[in-house]
């Protein structure tokens, strides 16, 4: 169960290279260096993400990206559910970059979801807005998607830089909630631990992504545990946020009774898959009992199994 992956970060490098060649484009040296593991800067990550995302210009490409996410799941195993909670940024693709229409984005997702369903994989879609663009942007995102929202669009989230307090975003989250969407937020990723508290108490967020800064305030760990707020953990993606696996807060989260699930985040950019994330999780030193609990909660709290298609 991949609890957190972004459509825009899912295209496989080989597909991107082929598509670039078809369009007579060269893959930037910085992007190739990042894929080879020779470049590690945030600038290299962004350059790679933006270049690959630039090929999401048709419904077929969108379906390919979702298919790539499905391929990164573990192989089928009796008794283990397979699913993806998929984050997408339609406003960025449709309005800001103007590289695909909303109709073609929905069509590609519908095709990809149907193909996944035939493979026994359930998919739910979460709409992502950008915190540092502010609440007005959040309302624009909802304006775009709520009019003809497919049934598999089940959630609303914010990402980006955590510069705007969640109390300012509260009306946007409330509008999304009233429209029937579940609420999530990237918090405690690049912002202070207090952003996690704000997201939960002031914006009504039901699920937190990353939350690596939560360990800085024991009261926030207690809040997450007491309210049973699920946390999406993306170990490879978090490599720039913690010194190493032995410093990742996942073991502390589980020991504190926090419900967690594993995700790949931007697997086509970071070159990771879910089996690899499980290996990294075990590398943090969690016990077999904690690993079993992590596996169970990854599925139990996944929106694709609760209300997804």
Q: What is each model feature region?
A:
Residues 186:
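Short HxH-centered metal-ligating active-site micro-motif
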Residues 1-181, 190-195, 202-203, 207, ...:
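Metal-cofactor-binding active-site regions of metalloenzymes
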